Amino acid sequence: VNQFNDIGGVNLCVNQKALSVDHLEVCGSEAIQSLIEGIEQAEGGAGAPTYPVALPGCSHFLSIPYTPGRAIIDAGLPLVLATDHNPGSAPSGDMTMVVRLASLKMGVLPVEAVAAATLNGAAAMEVADEVGCLALGHRANFVLTHPMEGIQDIAYRFTDAVVDKVFINGEIWEG
């Protein structure tokens, strides 16, 4: 809602109890405060929170500012990362690149970026009881990486193919 300007869409989405609000490239303190209030209302039993969704691929492709991911996380909000894969502003579905951009351009730690792309993404789509983490009763959707020193290498080795294998429902995906 705030891809190019703050149009008040964050507050509207929170008031309407939308599950998520995307395109937060322009996201100031008022918008962040509105998201905090939405989380507090949800914790008080007033519906689900409105998840803030960053789309760093759009920022990269359009050369516009990045969502203030660090400020959103520091405010205690569950940042979500997504691709917004479309031919106009984000012609890529590469989630590894999204995680890298969040780490390199939004001030998000690699471990936070992975959580934003998995756990928080599943929560924002209301499927966290099925996917988003490796847990008993969840579908086994995950990736194996090539050998790395640690999760920080995903961002540091920003041009390397770090994913070795993809598993969907516990089966190797050959796609």
What are the residue ranges of the model-derived segments?
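C-terminal cap of metal-dependent C-N hydrolases
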Residues: R139-G175
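Active-site-adjacent C-terminal substructures of enzyme catalytic domains
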Residues: N5-C133, F158, E174
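Histidine-centered catalytic micro-motifs
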Residues: V1-N2
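Cytochrome P450 C-terminal beta-domain/meander region
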Residues: A135-G137
